[in-house]
Regions:
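Anion-recognition interface
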Residues: 2-270
């Protein structure tokens, strides 16, 4: 079979929109499609070229690498169809901040994101319309646009939209709706951030493409961070939390500028 004749579907995340659940509990259970897991993403192009399945599903969640990765896959397989999931901006940025916090970043939320656009996370990182423009730039096919909230509210409707779009099948009895990774509490994250601000000023580097360095230089810190957060579970809340991890009023005011961006997503979501 020619590569141009193969049906290819590319789930691009975003990160913190239920991607891990899909990658662990749903995509491997789909029938009539070859799923290339996130752990094999780095060689997915070679896998597709060297095998002869009728259709393929690739999955990997992106944020700042979004355009680079979309361009890379579409350059090899222009027929690729995109699956993208968005989440309401306030919930999404909060979840992103917590993810970075548990990985050793000890800055405040205001330094992570602020209205002056001087934080680590910038306005261009927040605009979903920019990501939709990137998809339209490289793909001629209509993407499947989903909302993370629907996965929570009506999971089987959400999952069926993916199976229908990809021409695959699944059995409800095969799908576990259990959360794959539970979230850490505010108390645990604040305690870890205090620890890192004293003992680990710079977060450990993540070696995605080098397993040896990953296990030698990153994994020990990862294990220690988890131990610290586990320890925090047994400490009094009043001892740790002096102020909220994220100020809700500040968050609400900061996110108002993205109301129209979210309305655009609601108007095009499937």
């Amino acid at each position: 079979m020619k590569n141009s004749e193969k049906e290819i579907y590319f789930h691009v995340g975003l990160a913190k929109t239920g991607s891990t659940f899909l990658q662990n509990n749903f995509f491997p259970k789909l029938k009539d499609i070859k799923y290339i897991s996130t752990h094999k993403y780095w060689r997915c192009i070679n896998i597709i070229k060297r095998t002869n399945y009728k259709s393929y599903l690739i999955s990997r969640e992106f944020d700042r690498q979004f355009e680079f990765e979309v361009k890379k896959i579409l350059k090899e397989f222009p027929q690729t169809k995109i699956i993208v999931v968005f989440r309401k901006h306030d919930k999404w940025i909060s979840s992103q901040f917590k993810r970075y916090s548990k990985n050793g970043y000890h800055w405040s939320f205001e330094k992570f994101y602020n209205n002056d656009n001087t934080g680590f996370w910038r306005k261009e990182d927040m605009l979903y319309s920019i990501k939709m423009d990137i998809i339209k730039k490289y793909s001629k096919n209509k993407p499947l646009v989903l909302r993370f909230e629907e996965l929570k509210e009506n999971p089987y409707s959400y999952l069926s939209k993916i199976s229908n779009y990809t021409g695959s099948r699944y059995s409800k009895s095969d799908i576990s709706l259990n959360v794959v990774h539970g979230s850490w509490s505010e108390k645990q994250l604040i305690f870890l951030k205090k620890f890192c601000s004293i003992f680990k000023k710079n977060p450990p580097e993540y070696y995605a493409n080098n397993k040896i360095l990953h296990w030698l230089l990153y994994r020990p810190w990862w294990l220690l961070f988890h131990f610290i957060m586990y320890l925090a579970y047994f400490l009094p809340k009043s001892y740790i939390i002096k102020k909220p991890l994220i100020d809700k009023e500040y968050l609400s005011k900061s996110m108002k500028k993205y109301d129209n961006d979210w309305k655009k997503i609601l108007s095009i979501s499937d």
